[in-house]
Amino acid sequence: MLEVKNLSFAYKNNKEILNNISFGVEKGDFLAILGNNGAGKSTLLKCLNKILKVEKGSVILNSQDLIKMKTFEIAKKVALVGQNIPSLDISVRDMVMLGRKPHMKWKFTEEDDRIVEDAMARIGIDKDMHSSFISNISGGECQKVVLARALAQSPELLLLDEPTSSLDIKNQYIVLNLVKDLIKEKNIIGIVVIHDINLAMRYCNKALFLKDSQVYFSGNVEEINSHMIYDVYDVKSSIHEIKDQKIMLVD
């Protein structure tokens, strides 16, 4: 289980971006972090894996406080998939192998090789693509490679920062479906920052809304209603309703 308790964060010489944030996520849950631009969604993700130093609060993952752990220890437990795909001039297989780096001592082992092969197969990366260079494959395939790298880390917590923002609708569905299935299959915790509420309701079972640096709502996605969305998002809508779990926002 992940328990975030009274977490606050402010960049230097700025007001608090996150103020007393508390929420919990169980194994097997897929949590969507929602909110307006500047609400602190990506900042929260970076606090969870200590990219940003948290001065106040705790992040307890399976009874261990990540805030008190060293970076290399966190890397064994937490994987982050960002919206920007690394532009390294390496092969697909080598990119996925980087996911094992936190676990290795001096060299990669047969176990590392097995885990990497399994990760690529599970994500659906064809064997004839293993030797292809990252720069030569499509955006959708690149994002699958980054997911395979995260899976190769064998994480307890998978963080995703707008992982489908640069993809077309078809590839958005493919990637999020893969993530949803992996979270259930591996019984890990998944947290995604996402702007599209329809996608959040389709693939996630939990939601966390941030507004004015605080938690506005935390609960099941089924509890999301149109008034809540209107309150959180800075939109002027002539249509604002949920119908068959589809939210429509029309300017």
What is the predicted function of each stretch?
Residues 158-162:
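Catalytic Walker B motif of ABC-type/P-loop ATPase nucleotide-binding domains
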Residues 34-36:
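The feature captures the beta-strand-to-loop junction immediately N-terminal to the Walker
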Residues 154:
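Conserved catalytic motifs of ABC-family nucleotide-binding domains
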